[in-house]
Amino acid sequence: IVEKANARAQLLAFLRAEHEGEAGIVYCLSRRKVEETAAFLCAEGIRALPYHAGMDSPVRERNQTTFQREDGVVMAATIAFGMGIDKPDVRFVAHLDLPKSIEGYYQETGRAGRDGMAANAWMAYGLQDVVLQRRMIDESEADETFKRVLGVKLDAMLGLCETLSCRRM
């Protein structure tokens, strides 16, 4: 977990230093950010594809198939990507935005290293992520009980990000 300054540049440095040419998943909170991130990575010479629920189904399926079958593809995705994905050689899972819960983070990062080889979980985290998610919770049309549950989950995620002890496994 790194302090977010310029998340895309930080991601690029991480990929070039540790995962050049390897398969991975970059999770983003919005569809727009998925598209922008995939385009950015492609412009930097990294084979990246977007995946989100707003894409035409044939394009989404083609991108998923390419990711599953080919080596070295990076998938920029929302949480819509993941169910049924069992690519054993995913070397990293990165988050450009704070996940909504520890449970979600655990599930998403668990998609890396299924072949038993070393893999990394990486996240760029900043206080603005918390502010944005709190606003999304506050402005949602959910009932107050559900909003409280979401707030507790966000607080737990914040606790993980702010802990000073080692998170390396």
Indicate where each model-derived feature is located.
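Helicase motor core with emphasis on the C-terminal RecA-like subdomain
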Residues: I1-V152
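Cys/His-rich short segments
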Residues: V152-M169
